[in-house]
Amino acid sequence: MEIFQAAILGIIEGLTEFLPISSTGHLIVVSDWLGIEQTKQNTAFEVIIQVAAILAIFSHYKEKFSLQHLRLWNNVLIAFLPIAIIGFIFQDTVKAFFTIETVAWFFIIGGLIFLIMEKLYVDGKHRTQDIEDLTMRQAFWIGIIQVFALIPGTSRAGASIVGGVMMGLDRKTAAEFSFLLALPVLMAASGLDLLKHYEDFNNTSWTPLMVGFLMAFLAAWLTIKVFIKFLQTFTFNAFGVYRIVFGIVLLIWFV
């Protein structure tokens, strides 16, 4: 992998991991556009840039890592368990769905869901406005809905945000809980991939790895910061439209 390719993929990972637009879908598409083959070494690279995104969350929410926030992390764990169990059992079945056509259609379906969600969204004090105030019931159902993120093109962030809004969270709180929920999900996925591909790092050039890692961290850190500010003023409609347009482009271009 060339350095400029590593930089682009790092930026794509950082920009899309926490937005409701499917980081996996974008990495598949951009890798194809750049002519990057799915080798074991390149799979190992994707693990590294995902670790960078994880560190960006730690950097943003470091004040949450204390015993006084134990209730919050209990809810994160509850929401994590469904996708952990289902993902582990059906991981081979899920991999069979990784095609451009599947990604494209679920981009479109996800976009329509966001537009419908916003059409039905009613703001107000009845909505949970702080991640510390989530109930175990809300966390559980967010976790159940997040399971749909196993389908390529759905988006983990997208599924958990939709779940949050459906369970009564306001937009900002749904996004923030999605960020924290990404920690155990990404750590589990990255940990498994590291165990599978650790030998492949011996045949990987370290310069592209370092460049990709740095770009992913910076892009993810900035995305989290800007996204939260964005949701204080705007809705998810733009993401719904983007997903539909991107999905249609994929169908025309690749299928």
UniProtKB/Swiss-Prot annotation:
BP GO terms, sorted: cell wall organization; peptidoglycan biosynthetic process; regulation of cell shape; response to antibiotic
Major enzyme class: hydrolase
Major subcellular site: membrane
EC number: 3.6.1.27
GO molecular function list: undecaprenyl-diphosphatase activity
Keywords annotated in UniProt: Antibiotic resistance, Cell inner membrane, Cell membrane, Cell shape, Cell wall biogenesis/degradation, Hydrolase, Membrane, Peptidoglycan synthesis, Transmembrane, Transmembrane helix
Listed InterPro entries: UppP
GO cellular component assignments: plasma membrane
Subcellular location: Cell inner membrane
Keyword Cell inner membrane listed: yes
Other facts: Bacitracin is thought to be involved in the inhibition of peptidoglycan synthesis by sequestering undecaprenyl diphosphate, thereby reducing the pool of lipid carrier available.
Family of this protein: Belongs to the UppP family.
Task performed by this protein: Catalyzes the dephosphorylation of undecaprenyl diphosphate (UPP). Confers resistance to bacitracin.
Name of the protein this chain belongs to: Undecaprenyl-diphosphatase
Gene (UniProt): uppP
